[in-house]
Amino acid sequence: MLKNVETKVSFLKGSSQTTLTGKFQGYDDVRYRVFAKSGQILKFNINSYGNLAYINIFAPGQKPGKDKPLFVGSTVGFSGEVTLPVDGDYIVQVYQMKKSAQRNRAVSFNLDLQILDNKK
């Protein structure tokens, strides 16, 4: 049975960044719910042993496994940023690619997240 753990991300008062650590195995994933406003920028950097962990970012109301991601990390890499289109709770999904998931690999990761105001 798949385990899909979802955790709400809270930033320390006065801070717009945090480092999250986690672990999952096989086809399981880890999901973080992050509130942000339209026009803000979500920056990320993910590190894992063997570079097995990737992220997808889903817009508010969209669900992993059901909807298309707003941002697909496996096509971009392990760090980047995305300008967010609407206010709401975004889901950051941490997962591994099918080839290593089939081998039931255990993946430990560190994920740096930062929310920035877009300076226009």
Task: Describe each PLM feature range.
Residues 6, 19, 52-53, 108:
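N-terminal functional modules and adjacent low-complexity/disordered segments of proteins
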Residues 1-28:
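Transition segment at domain starts
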Residues 2-10, 32, 90-120:
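C-terminal edge strands of extracellular/lumenal beta-sandwich accessory domains
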Residues 23-88, 93-97:
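Acidic, Ser/Thr/Pro-rich low-complexity intrinsically disordered segments
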